[in-house]
Structures are given as structure tokens and as C-alpha cells.
Amino acid sequence: MPELAEVRLTADYVNGMVEKKTFFEVRKNPSHKGKLFECPDSFRISAVSRGKEFKLLLEHSGGTEHLLMTMGMSGYFKVTPTGEEIKHSHLMFDAEDGTTLSFVDVRRFGKWSFNDWNKDRGPDPVNDKKGFTDYVMSNLSKPAFNKPLHEVLMNQKYFNGIGNYLRAEIIYKLGDVDPFLPARDAILSDRGSDLLELCSQIPYEAYLLGGGNLYTWETPQGIEIHTSLGSWTDWMQCYGNPSMEKILDGIGRRFWFDPKWKK
């Protein structure tokens, strides 16, 4: 599933590919359960992300519509010549220059609706670092933080954008905090500020590296990869590493961690 880095890169791709295009029509693959909606005869498109959330902004003479989209397990966008959309394209925007922006979703888990950001998700740890930190600290008394650190890092209400591989790298690179401690204790420890800093730093590094080379993810065309951080395989030290331990956590996801924390 795309995490913060991949969703932000998706927004970059869309913005880079459609910046000067004018669109006139929207189409939907009838095999998808999502609703087809009407658009003005002439509109522009831009994209923005917040954690794992993604929006297309449809700007026209009457204002701007906010199309909130979930990427599902493997959703992404692709620009092609109109009529040459790739297989599993489910929502298509046709431009006047003869190209089409398509939402491609092999597993059809992605959804769309006209809405603002989800009120049940917290601030973006990268784009709104202070807001993220303040939000976590102001909610530490909530029962959610009684759970182990490794599970709470997956709670999108507080850690919007942190997913399976990012939590593994955050905890591993923090180094000396037991991931099975209650999250509240870990955050209030003398390493708590470092933990929250890594929740911003690690997703941003993954973004600079072009996103996770995991499963169906491919870095979008035209995205600059910052090689100063090394290669993705060098950077990814914990997740998927056969020398690490792994368990199924309380939410059914596989958690990779340093063997020193094995109980």
C-alpha cells in the first residue's frame, strides 16, 4: 500500500505532467463501482497530498472542486495519449492536447469522492512537522497510546502516512527504544523527541529516494531521485531484511524489528 512518500511522489507526478493542460471530459471504467461525476467543459487539474491522503483539485471558472481519492493497495496515475489508456484505468480525464490522465488500480480498492481531508487523520509529519508533533503530544492521554509503539505508529489518526515499511525503519533507526513498550512511555522517554523527529525524517528520505521499491510500486516517470542518500537497498535496513525478526502485530500486519527486542 502506498505510504506517505509514494503518495507525495504521485502528487508530484500529476503536477508535473498536467501543469499546462486544459481538460474537458471525465470518463469512468464501467467495471469500477465508483460514481461518475460531471465536470465543466474546461478545467485544470493539480494534486496535493497529506500523509496517505491524496486530492485532485479541479479548477474551473466557477471555483475549485476537491476530489479526495484513496490509492488502495496499488493505485497510481498515468498520462497517455487519449485512447491508449493502459489496462485497469478506472477514472480518466481527457485533455485538449489529446492526452489522458488515468487513475490505474489493478485491485480496484481505490475510491474517490468530493470531500475535504479526512477529519479522522492527523497532520502530515513532513509537510506540517510542528502540527504533527503538537497533535501527538496533545493526545497522549488517549487510550490509543496504551498500545505498543509499533502498533500505534500505524494509527493514521495520529501518524498519517506512516505504514509498514516506514514504521520498521523509524523504530530500527531510533535504535534503543523497545518497540513493544506502550507508545505513551516511548514518546515521553528521553528519546521521545528523536522518535517524533524520525517520523518526519524517514518518510522524507524515502520520498527523496523515489519511494519504496516494494511490490507493484514504480517511481513515476520524471521524478528526480536524490542519490546523495545512497541507494534504496542501502537505505532500507530493517523491513524485509532476512536477518531481522518479524511477527504479526495486533492489527494483522507483519512487523519487522531488530532481533535484540525479541521476547
What do these predicted ranges mean?
Residues M1-W112, L188-Q201, G222, S231, ...:
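Gly/Gly-Pro- and Ser/Thr-rich, intrinsically disordered tail segments characteristic of DNA damage-repair
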Residues M17, K21, P143-K147, N160, ...:
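Short secondary-structure junctions and interdomain/linker hinges
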Residues V26, K33, A168, Y172, ...:
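A sequence-level detector of short, solvent-exposed, charge-rich linear segments
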Residues L36, F145-K147, M236:
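Hydrophobic alpha-helical segments with strong N-terminal bias
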Residues D41-F43, V152-M154, P242:
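Short hydrophobic "helix-edge" motifs at membrane interfaces and signal-peptide entry regions
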Residues V48, M69-G72, D128, Y158-N160, ...:
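Generic detector of intrinsically disordered, low-complexity, polar/charged segments
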Residues G63-D176, F180, D185-S200, I251, ...:
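Phosphate/anion-contacting hairpin/loop surfaces
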Residues S200-K263:
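C-terminal accessory segment of soluble enzyme catalytic cores
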